[in-house]
Amino acid sequence: MRMVDLIEKKRDGGVLTDDEIRFIVRGFTDGSIPDYQMSAFAMTVFYKGMTDHETAVLTDAMMHSGDTVDLSRFGDKSVDKHSTGGVGDKTTLIVAPIVSSLGGKMAKMSGRGLGHTGGTVDKLESIPGYQTTLSADAFMRQVEQVGVAVIGQSGNLTPADKKLYALRDVTATIDSLPLITSSIMSKKLAAGAHSIVLDVKIGSGAFMKTLEDGQKLAESMVRIGRACGRNVVAVMSNMDIPLGFYIGNALEVREAVEVLQGHGCPDLTGVCITLAANMLHLCNGWPIEEATKQAQEAISSGRAFEQMKRWIAAQGGDVAVLDNVDLLPQASVQYELKAPQAGYIHHMDAQKIGESSAILGAGRKTKDDVIDPAAGIVLKEKTGAKVVQGQTLAVLHTDRPETLADAERVFLEAIRWGADVPAAQPLIYGIVTE
């Protein structure tokens, strides 16, 4: 089998066999297929696409290119959530305690933030003492005993995806549905959960900017996940505005605590209840109505907040900061950003707001940058609000006052003003089950 023949076959619109796809993934992973041939192959897929079967085989081959996590000891109870990334997305911090307090087993590997999107691991590391690295035995033992463990991603999960993603990033082949699907799903399948709920973010702060593109991705990932033998549901949620009012790391832990204590932002709470209910539907077999009721009661009874404390304590975190969020890292400068004009906020570009937060120190430009856990933004008004000139729109938190002017400029670029009340937007666009 020669790689050049397979590139030619796909270039001419042919359908690759299972063996041909596995040959490509194996050869690229071990280095026998060079970058220039894999780049050419990625471009042929970009233009010619793949069938669902080809995409499923590609996903499976990438999943098995490195280590996989065996969660079979937890049976149907093992469940995971994956977000396609957004701004202010602290849902894992809220959903994990809800689901694990009701019998779900969440053995979760999460990523770090890059660019305008935040990462769950960075948020958790803003809790003093929290350990994001555990041995395999300690990881499994904690899931067994507590019901949840969240750590950073392992070094040798899906090495084929790591190599291919880096190549796609510099060859203009990121926006290919089969390649996006196989990239996301290979990582999720390698992480071992029996059931997976995908939070597909759609809008200005998301990878998928339009509902049409978001729906295509959601449907593709659900089909491929099911073809690979897992229970998969996708929730399509709105990321045209940041989720909740807090953007940053310690700031988002604070907001997660507010939700679990029953007095959080209604929009954020609503999205988390929807995600948790779908996870409980898959792992416990409950009807959605019952799962929703149980998730709501886990918050109102305090059960989910107590579970959060058990989880954080098990990984070495200082639980005192959950009981008193003022003990979390706080920025030395808290600057009130004022509205330059009166009117209705018609649109907030979530990506730009995420970029503003990153400028303050809450995010990274490159993967080696060090973040400031205290930096970020607290929104005081959101899309739909009527404001007067000089009213506080947001509070910028930073330990680097020299970044304020740049961060303020980018934040104000994110806002589109209007004279009348804007149309309300849905929080959830829909749920894909097949």
Q: How would you label these PLM feature ranges?
A:
Residues 109, 143, 151-154, 184, ...:
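Short beta-strand segments
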